[in-house]
Amino acid sequence: MTTSSYFLLVALGLLLYVCRSSFGSEHTCESDASPHPQGVCGSPLAEAVEAACELEESLQGGTGKKRGRASLLRKRRAFLSMLKARAKRNEASPLQRSGRGIVCECCKNHCNLEELTEYCPPVTEGSG
């Protein structure tokens, strides 16, 4: 291996390391990790996502249609009730999967409003 090839390989490795560390806002969890002291778990987590989604929708101006809004709220509530059920299953299961997800980001770690809104169902103008 020539010196220039070796230098290129080291530079590429450093670039990958910098890129990976700059995206460090993503949380990872181990299956045996305990909840963060400021983490939100279970039903309060689903309620926090619901509040964050409603805030995001109001900041974006909502759907603008009253008829479509009722259908949109039903869809959002169905999504959030599914999220609550999933959170309860995750709390009850002793063998939780490791990795990333809302439980990892907001229960096992402390998440912010921006991270909560990543879990909002998509809002479309034509919902209804």
Swiss-Prot record:
InterPro entries: Insulin-like, Insulin-like_sf, Insulin-rel_pep, Insulin_CS, Insulin_family
Predominant localisation class: secreted
Tissue specificity statement from the Swiss-Prot or TrEMBL entry: Expressed by the venom gland.
Propeptide position ranges: 59-89
One GO molecular-function entry: hormone activity
Pfam family, one: Insulin
Sites bearing 4-carboxyglutamate, chain numbering: E115
Family assignment from sequence similarity: Belongs to the insulin family.
UniProt name for this protein: Con-Ins F2b
